Regions:
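Activation segment signature within eukaryotic-like protein kinase domains
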Residues: 131-132
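Conserved short submotifs of the Hanks-type protein kinase catalytic core
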Residues: 95-108
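Protein kinase glycine-rich loop
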Residues: 27-34, 38
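Glycine-rich ATP phosphate-binding loop
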Residues: 37-58
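Terminal C-lobe "cap" of eukaryotic-type protein kinase domains
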Residues: 279-283, 289-304
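Conserved N-lobe beta3->alphaC-helix segment of eukaryotic protein kinase catalytic domains
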Residues: 55-79
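Catalytic-loop of the protein kinase fold
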Residues: 143-160, 166-176
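Short beta-strand micro-motifs within the conserved protein kinase catalytic domain, predominantly
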Residues: 86-97
Length: 362
């Protein structure tokens, strides 16, 4: 009976008409993987374009089903963030599982790298920093939600080009997506390997991007495995050759050596990429640290300095004011000096005010 079929599987749809065919118009296949295929579709109801992932339905109750459901559960936990591919819906029909996600009009970073390779090009410094910064923002959000991605690589980073046509209509509502002057947004997708930081069920991602400690089944610093994979992703975007799956070169990289990059990048930037693949995960910067890193956000560094200076000045002023409240300066000075405005002014001006010292916790 139809009822009998539905038990024990959270993904069963009982009605026989395909929801996929009914609700979506398939335009083209845009991706294919071991799981199945991704199609660019228009939803008939709203006229919007979506990326629809159709995969062979795993056996109910199998470990494959758990894996297939990870992505759905992860999206449910995560909610919406500008640097994570947005999730809309998931369901199952006949022998397929279907996930409806945001469509990124620029394809994946992997697509862009293949295109670059054909033309003998690669991403340059400014773009590389932009990718690193934006993906770090997505990772910061994922990690702060208590999750890790565990499959960061070019084919799981998606590119959205802001269309110029969007013009003036939506200019008032400036959200975090407008920070990026380049008009390109990079987003993390494919959450099929996502797991919890505190209670991880690790399904290893791509060997080429895998940190050694994860291979050794040491899971105490899992977010740093995402950082490791992100560094190698940036190296590839910078023009590095294909990464090894194993062997001597694989181990050479795990000792903290960035794959050779065919363009001149600033030392500070290369040092950062090197730090991100440090053999000791504790030494690698967190995603939060990357989002504030002076190499990626030089203007932020200036702002922080000015903020500190301002705080110091505020502190001095406050202390001077409280001192003057407690003991009026006039009480401390001989008559002749109080009458001389110049001196009291100099005392308050703080230039040669040596009457107290204080330290600030920076």
């Amino acid at each position: 009976s139809a009822m009998g079929q539905r038990t024990g599987c959270p993904l069963k749809e009982s009605n026989m008409v395909s929801r996929y065919k009914k609700e979506f118009l398939e335009l083209e296949r845009i991706g294919v993987g071991e799981f199945g295929s991704v199609y660019k579709c228009i939803k008939r109801l709203d006229g919007c374009v979506y990326a629809i992932k159709r995969s062979k339905r795993p056996l109910a109750g199998s470990s494959d089903e758990q894996l297939a459901l990870r992505e759905v559960y992860a999206h449910a936990v995560l909610g919406h963030h500008p640097h994570v591919v947005r999730y809309y819906s998931a369901w199952a029909e006949d022998d397929h599982m279907i996930i409806q996600n945001e469509h990124c009009n620029g394809g994946s970073l992997q697509d862009a790298l293949l295109e670059n390779a054909k033309r003998g090009q690669y991403f340059l410094e400014a773009e590389l920093k932009e990718i690193l910064l934006q993906v770090s923002m997505g990772l910061k959000y994922i990690h702060n939600s208590g999750l890790v991605h565990l499959d960061i690589k070019p084919s799981n980073i998606f590119i959205c080009h802001k269309l110029a046509v969007e013009g003036h209509a939506g200019q008032e509502e400036s959200d975090s997506e407008d920070e990026f002057s380049s008009g390109v947004m990079y987003k993390i997708g494919d959450l099929g390997h996502v797991t919890s930081i505190t209670n991880p069920q690790v399904e290893e991602g791509d060997r080429r991007f895998l940190a050694n400690e994860v291979l050794q089944e040491q899971y105490c610093h899992l977010p740093k495995a995402d950082i490791f994979a992100l560094s190698l992703t940036i190296a590839l975007a910078a023009g590095a050759g294909p990464l090894p799956h194993n062997g001597a070169m694989w181990h050479h990289i795990r000792k903290g050596n960035v794959p050779s990059i065919p363009q001149k990048l600033p030392d500070g930037f290369l040092e950062l990429l090197k730090l991100m693949i440090h053999p000791d995960p504790v030494e690698r910067p967190s995603a939060t640290a990357l989002t504030k890193h002076p190499v990626l956000r030089p203007s932020l560094e200036k702002t922080v300095q000015l903020q500190k200076q301002l705080n110091v000045e505020k502190c001095k002023t406050a202390m001077l004011e409280s001192l003057m409240k407690d003991q009026p300066l006039s009480a401390k000075l001989p008559e002749s000096e109080t009458s001389s405005k110049q001196n009291s002014k100099r005392l308050v001006g703080g230039k040669n005010c040596r009457s107290f010292s204080f330290t600030l916790g920076y």
